[in-house]
């Protein structure tokens, strides 16, 4: 069975809502989906000052330490918001951590998409 990862970073939950809809659509055609979120890098005090809601407990956290899990997926969907025209640091941290996977060709042939 085809196995897709949806990897998101969602500070206020908007990207998470999109991710959940996309997950339902992918699953509706018989594809297995694992919903992941980037590890938060902002201190809890900053998140509180920004009035950020708690992270969803049903979405597993992907960290630089376990980023090699991406090797096991047939494809990856990236859910990212824009921060002043760039991707959030939390997503960039995960992407930077995939250097070893890239160097060893472990991401070659994987389908990818961004929303």
Across the structure, where does each feature detected by a protein language model lie?
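N-terminal beta1-alpha1-beta2 submodule of the flavodoxin-like/Rossmannoid cofactor-binding fold
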Residues: 1-107
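Short, glycine-/small-residue-rich phosphate/pyrophosphate-handling segment
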Residues: 108-115
């Amino acid at each position: 069975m085809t196995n897709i990862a949806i990897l998101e970073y969602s500070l206020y939950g908007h990207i998470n809502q999109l991710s959940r809809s996309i997950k339902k659509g992918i699953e509706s055609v018989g594809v297995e989906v694992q919903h992941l979120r980037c590890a938060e890098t902002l201190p809890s005090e900053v998140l509180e000052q920004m009035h950020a809601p708690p992270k969803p407990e049903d979405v597993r956290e992907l960290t630089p330490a376990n980023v090699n899990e991406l090797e096991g997926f047939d494809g990856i969907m990236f859910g990212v918001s824009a921060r002043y025209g760039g991707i959030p640091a939390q997503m960039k941290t995960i992407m930077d951590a995939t250097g070893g996977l890239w160097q060893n060709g472990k991401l070659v042939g994987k389908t990818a998409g961004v929303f």
